[in-house]
């Protein structure tokens, strides 16, 4: 089990450091594969409920050691109950190699409006040939099922009137928690993810209203996290210790190296961007000996930019937005990045970059109320005028 670097648990303080510069490509080296494996949790057995849905057996807990080697297994995991007593079922694909090896888990659908992440995982699993593999790859595709059914970021609950909960603030959850989403997280983490995982990749996209390019979020102080992230040909990495409640942070707390790829915009498939993440994921499998083959393009080939902070530019007025920069554009302090007009067409606000950095997110809606994130910048220097860290 790796020794995790000490982390200040305050969410805001995690994002305060703004001191990193883009690393010279010659200085970016792959971390060596971690020696040893995370502490093994108590073994759980596979429990079949006896139900079959669309030809797939249903499990309430899974141990991939129980599955036949050299094959793909399609299952449903029985999650938390709905208000009518039926369960939410989560789609699980296990590619069980013919030989033992690393166990790598891919997740998507923690936010319900993030479609390219799901497509990326589906594509990866479709390319695997278990008979040629050493180890196991498990994909869990639609974790926040009710959010996905309504194509929205947050989990809808009706226990205290209608409310929306961000599932990616609930991990590792609690099987006996005070909300359905907390219980779903607890069931999935304790009975499916943690017992079957040595390395984990939690795929996301931007959210409705905020577009992002291809980039990663992860803590590069952890050797296996650094190694995995640099195996993707992505143009940017946010080197960031995750705060509590996020799935990849829950993995790390459990001794399992993990990070989050961000696969473009929400709500639609970006078929130009997903191949970047498919290629990188295959590189991870090859690096860790799960599948044979030569490693393809990596972060070095993409001239990767690494930032330590994400600094937002917030709207100060309501009105119509006119963006003056694009995703992945380099910006400098004082550079005008957007302006805002009222209904008469009069300019009511102009916005400038507080830092040197790379544009990592842009508001996609053409209007905004005051206080919304207009854009955020992956920063390589301390912000001017006390600019606040990105609140996500």
PLM regions and their residue ranges:
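N-terminal secretory signal peptides
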Residues: 1-9, 16-27
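Structured catalytic-domain cores with a bias toward divalent-metal coordination
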Residues: 2, 9-15, 32-392
């Amino acid at each position: 089990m790796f020794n995790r670097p000490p982390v200040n648990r305050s969410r805001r303080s995690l994002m305060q450091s703004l001191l990193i510069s883009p690393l010279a490509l010659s200085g970016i080296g792959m971390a060596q594969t971690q020696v040893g494996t995370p502490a093994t949790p108590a073994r759980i057995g596979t429990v079949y409920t006896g139900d079959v849905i669309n030809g797939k057996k249903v499990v309430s807990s899974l141990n991939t050691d129980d599955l036949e080697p050299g094959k793909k297994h399609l299952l449903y995991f029985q999650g938390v109950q709905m208000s009518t007593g039926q369960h939410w079922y989560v789609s699980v694909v296990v590619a069980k190699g013919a030989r033992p090896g690393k166990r790598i888990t891919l997740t998507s659908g923690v936010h319900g409006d993030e479609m390219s992440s799901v497509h990326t995982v589906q594509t990866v699993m479709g390319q695997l040939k278990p008979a040629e593999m050493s180890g196991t790859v498990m994909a869990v595709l639609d974790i926040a099922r009710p959010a996905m059914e309504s194509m929205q970021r947050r989990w809808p609950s009706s226990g205290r009137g209608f409310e929306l909960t961000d599932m990616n603030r609930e991990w590792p959850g609690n099987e006996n928690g005070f909300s359905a989403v907390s219980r779903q997280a607890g069931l999935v983490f304790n009975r499916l993810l943690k017992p079957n995982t040595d390395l984990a990749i939690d795929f996301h996209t931007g959210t409705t209203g905020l577009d992002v390019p291809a980039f990663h979020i992860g803590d590069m102080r952890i050797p296996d996290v650094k190694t995995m992230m640099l195996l993707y040909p992505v143009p940017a990495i946010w080197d960031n210790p995750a705060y509590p409640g996020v799935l990849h942070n829950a993995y790390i707390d459990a001794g399992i190296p993990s990070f989050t790829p961000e696969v473009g915009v929400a709500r639609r498939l970006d078929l130009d961007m997903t191949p970047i993440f498919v290629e990188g994921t295959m590189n991870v499998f090859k690096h860790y000996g799960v599948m044979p083959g030569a490693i393809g393009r990596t972060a070095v080939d993409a001239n990767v930019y690494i930032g330590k902070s994400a600094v937002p530019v917030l709207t100060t007025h309501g009105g119509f937005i006119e963006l003056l920069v694009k995703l992945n554009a380099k910006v400098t302090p004082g550079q005008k990045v957007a302006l805002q007009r009222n209904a008469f067409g009069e300019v009511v606000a102009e916005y400038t970059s507080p830092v040197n950095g790379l544009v990592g997110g842009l508001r996609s809606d053409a209007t905004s109320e005051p206080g919304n994130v207009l854009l955020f910048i992956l920063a390589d220097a301390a912000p001017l005028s006390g600019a606040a860290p990105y609140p996500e």
